[in-house]
């Protein structure tokens, strides 16, 4: 270990920055975040530093560096493009035992400034010892994604209760366990979900009622898993997936996402395949209630977004009636994910000024929709769960005035490495789907925007599964074929 990691208190303490350019500005900004008293010595200042001087946020010595400038400084940073001057500042500070940093010259540094994650009062510093600042920034960005901004406010809450808890629990070991139980459970989760007042109430109650939070009731996390690609999960979704005691998941959640769930969590498959519901919806609702009443943290994991054809409303309605705490985490809905990964913008000023989401789910062999509304021009219609009802969808749209040549796309396993896009028309799509043995999950997009797929498609999976189609000058499909199978239709 070439550098010892340490955090310095610089509030109201005198620090010196040698240099007045953009590099010096970055260092001044860091010092000001720590509430240091900053003096800049430089014949000239960049506009941003000049603005700070104008409002007395920094002191400026408008001249060259002099040895006496380091007197009474607790920290010095050399940020000039004069290597001889930088070296002189370093040697001078070293002789006087003043911590010194020379930008981009680690061999001249008594200390280095790491790449930082600021969740004040929480701070995380990442350093490569000056060997690779770029790598340090990359590592910081990865770590940063796992530390929500609310952790800073949570730390401030804990700080506010430290003395009170210490007085109530004088034993060090018992006090540690108290904080562990709270921060690994209800207080943190309430805080992260924006219920900060409830978090304070829980903390107060824990202090008043025997200090034990193990009898706290469970909670349900209704989480949207997105369309399939794990990289499209939200930070909050991933955090709750790692926290859950039990997971109730559907068929539409991709295996790659299931792999990210906490390893020792109990897994309950709820099914939701067409006509094969392992658990009826009412039983799922009651299952969530029962598990939460057992004190478990229950992850209800759904493909896409739980409030878009996901029956999330039905589930939380039951939870509300039973008084079960819950939180809802939105996911990228299949329409947004599959369209984006297929190069099909759902709205476009030249083609569509509206987009409609509809369910293509069959009920008693038919699809009960407002077909007149869906047949309106200059809009895009997206059908969820429409594979089995595809012939009915095409027939009804044409019967209500939509041209048989209207472009149509079917996206299979969208956003994953197995994504396949079949492009045709209302007239041709039913036969194309038969030829390519399409399997769910699928999404259907109807509208002029589908014409843009061939030009805008950007996502190229490891194996090219795109079914290409060629449009005539009138927008009609004249040929469709799979690049993997060589079939034609």
Curated annotation (Swiss-Prot):
UniProt keyword annotation of Lyase present: yes
Residues reported in the UniProt entry to bind S-adenosyl-L-methionine: 227, 303-305, 308, 333-334, 385, 414
Superkingdom of origin organism: Bacteria
Catalyses which reaction(s): uroporphyrinogen III + 2 S-adenosyl-L-methionine = precorrin-2 + 2 S-adenosyl-L-homocysteine + H(+); precorrin-2 + NAD(+) = sirohydrochlorin + NADH + 2 H(+); siroheme + 2 H(+) = sirohydrochlorin + Fe(2+)
Molecular functions per Gene Ontology: NAD binding; precorrin-2 dehydrogenase activity; sirohydrochlorin ferrochelatase activity; uroporphyrin-III C-methyltransferase activity
Keywords in alphabetical order: Cobalamin biosynthesis, Lyase, Methyltransferase, Multifunctional enzyme, NAD, Oxidoreductase, Porphyrin biosynthesis, S-adenosyl-L-methionine, Transferase
Membrane-spanning segments: none
Record-linked SUPFAM superfamilies: NAD(P)-binding Rossmann-fold domains, Siroheme synthase middle domains-like, Tetrapyrrole methylase
Region feature Uroporphyrinogen-III C-methyltransferase, mapped onto this chain: 218-489
Disulfide bonds: none
Region of interest: Precorrin-2 dehydrogenase /sirohydrochlorin ferrochelatase: 1-203
Active site: 250, 272
Residues holding NAD(+): 22-23, 43-44
Pathway(s) this gene product operates in, as recorded in its UniProt entry: Cofactor biosynthesis; adenosylcobalamin biosynthesis; precorrin-2 from uroporphyrinogen III: step 1/1; Cofactor biosynthesis; adenosylcobalamin biosynthesis; sirohydrochlorin from precorrin-2: step 1/1; Porphyrin-containing compound metabolism; siroheme biosynthesis; precorrin-2 from uroporphyrinogen III: step 1/1; Porphyrin-containing compound metabolism; siroheme biosynthesis; siroheme from sirohydrochlorin: step 1/1
Function: Then it catalyzes the NAD-dependent ring dehydrogenation of precorrin-2 to yield sirohydrochlorin. Finally, it catalyzes the ferrochelation of sirohydrochlorin to yield siroheme.
NCBIfam families documented for this protein: cobA_cysG_Cterm, cysG_Nterm, PRK06136.1, PRK10637.1
Family: In the N-terminal section; belongs to the precorrin-2 dehydrogenase / sirohydrochlorin ferrochelatase family.
UniProt name for this protein: Siroheme synthase
Organism: Thioalkalivibrio sulfidiphilus (strain HL-EbGR7)
Source lineage: Bacteria, Pseudomonadati, Pseudomonadota, Gammaproteobacteria, Chromatiales
């Amino acid at each position: 270990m070439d550098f010892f990691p340490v955090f310095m208190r610089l509030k109201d303490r005198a620090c010196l920055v040698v240099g007045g350019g953009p590099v010096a500005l970055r260092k001044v900004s860091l010092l000001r975040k720590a509430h240091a008293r900053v003096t800049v010595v430089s014949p000239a200042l960049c506009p941003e530093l000049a603005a700070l001087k104008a409002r007395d946020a920094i002191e400026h010595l408008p001249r060259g560096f002099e040895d006496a400038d380091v007197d009474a400084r607790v920290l010095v940073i050399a940020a000039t493009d004069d290597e001889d001057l930088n070296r002189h500042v370093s040697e001078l500070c070293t002789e006087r035992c003043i911590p010194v940093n020379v930008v981009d010259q680690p061999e001249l540094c008594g200390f280095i400034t790491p790449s930082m994650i600021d969740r004040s009062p929480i701070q995380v510093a990442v350093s490569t010892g000056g060997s690779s600042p770029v790598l340090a920034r990359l590592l910081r960005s990865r770590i940063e994604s796992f530390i929500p901004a609310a952790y800073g406010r949570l730390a401030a809450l804990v700080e506010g209760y430290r003395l009170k808890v210490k007085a109530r629990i004088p034993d060090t070991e018992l006090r540690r366990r108290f904080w562990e139980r709270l921060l690994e459970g209800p207080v943190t989760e309430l805080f992260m979900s924006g219920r900060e007042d409830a978090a304070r109430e829980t903390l107060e109650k824990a202090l008043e009622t025997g200090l034990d939070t193990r009898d706290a009731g469970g909670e349900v996390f209704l989480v949207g898993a997105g369309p399939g690609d794990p990289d499209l999960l939200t930070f909050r979704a991933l955090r709750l997936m790692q926290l859950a005691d039990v997971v109730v998941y559907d068929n539409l959640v991709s295996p790659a996402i299931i792999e990210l769930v906490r390893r020792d969590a109990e897994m309950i498959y709820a099914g939701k395949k067409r006509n094969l519901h392992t658990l009826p919806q009412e039983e799922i609702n009651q299952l969530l209630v029962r598990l939460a009443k057992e004190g478990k943290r229950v992850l209800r994991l759904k493909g896409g977004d739980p409030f878009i054809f996901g029956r999330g409303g039905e589930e939380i309605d039951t939870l509300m009636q039973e008084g079960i705490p819950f939180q809802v985490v939105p996911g990228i809905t299949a329409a947004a994910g599959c369209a984006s990964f297929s190069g099909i913008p759902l709205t476009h000023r030249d083609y569509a000024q509206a987009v409609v989401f509809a369910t293509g789910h069959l009920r008693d062999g038919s699809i009960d929709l407002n077909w007149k509304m869906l047949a309106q021009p200059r809009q895009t219609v997206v059908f969820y769960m429409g594979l089995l009802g595809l012939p009915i969808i095409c027939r009804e749209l044409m019967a209500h005035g939509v041209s048989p040549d209207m472009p149509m796309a079917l996206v299979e396993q969208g956003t994953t490495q197995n994504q396949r896009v079949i492009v045709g028309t209302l007239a041709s799509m039913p036969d194309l789907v038969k030829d390519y043995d399409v399997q769910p999950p699928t999404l259907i997009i109807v509208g002029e925007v589908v014409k843009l797929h061939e030009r805008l498609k950007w996502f190229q999976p490891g194996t090219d599964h795109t079914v290409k189609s060629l449009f005539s000058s009138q927008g009609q499909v004249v040929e469709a074929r799979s690049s993997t199978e060589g079939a034609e239709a």
